[in-house]
Amino acid sequence: MSKSPDPTRDELFAEPLKQPELFTFSEAVAGVFPDMINRSVPGYATVVAMTGVLAAQHARPDSTIYDLGCSWGASLLSAARKIDHPSCQLIGIDNSEAMLKRARLNFQEQLGDQRVVLRASDIMDIQLENASVVILNYTLQFVPIMHRETLLRRIRSAMLPGDVLILSEKLTLPDPQLNDYLIELHHNFKRQQGYSDLEIAQKRQALEDVLIPETRHQHVERLHQVGFSRCDIWFQCLNFASLIAIA
């Protein structure tokens, strides 16, 4: 007797598609998102775990911790578990109601924390206030490049000196040959996670013109331009990195 397919396993690109649609955070994607991101982003679990550690280091009493593009809420949950200040409020923002539906269940089942608020909104439309910690894990890369500085400037304006932005992104490298080498290493990583060449190719096509990576230099330069005093990479695995920016 054959096993029933696992509905939480990412097989969205397993069958040939005439023309893969542009990638969106749809109901189908939301349903398999934890499996998708863990099998697609090397070092993801480490980034999530350390997000909690970094957030706890910088969270101020009576301040707000924001997770912009929170999806299922893994990073915000990590922060909530590590932050000791009961007066801190934690706010998760996502424009996908399908993601937020699962995030609400996630928090109810694992935390039941009344400090956590989840909101459906475009992160470009929100007003940030008294933000001691802002989490942008694998979110900025989906924001059009022309709007990224505006968002980061708004984040910095909501902070006091010493507050922190945690920014995780897929990177591109200025050396084309090294960039291609890391892309192929990433594809090999995904093969080791059980993805087929067809799945890798079709998802890459779906993400083209949707996920736009930048170089480390571009990120650091922009962060300085909007007013962060210090910033650099604290973790990297292949072409995925996490930066910390201190206000």
Language model: regions and residue ranges:
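A conserved beta-strand element that flanks and buttresses the S-adenosyl-L-methionine
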Residues: 135
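Class I SAM-dependent methyltransferase SAM/SAH-binding core
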Residues: 66, 73-124
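Conserved class I S-adenosyl-L-methionine
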Residues: 166-192
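Short alpha-helix
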Residues: 209-226
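A short glycine-rich, Lys/Arg-flanked "PGG" loop and its adjoining helix->strand segment in the class I
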Residues: 149-161
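Conserved alpha-helix/loop element of class I SAM-dependent methyltransferases that forms part
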Residues: 43-61
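Class I SAM-dependent methyltransferase Rossmann-like catalytic core
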Residues: 18-23, 29-47
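N-terminal auxiliary segments of SAM/dcSAM-dependent transferases
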Residues: 1-22
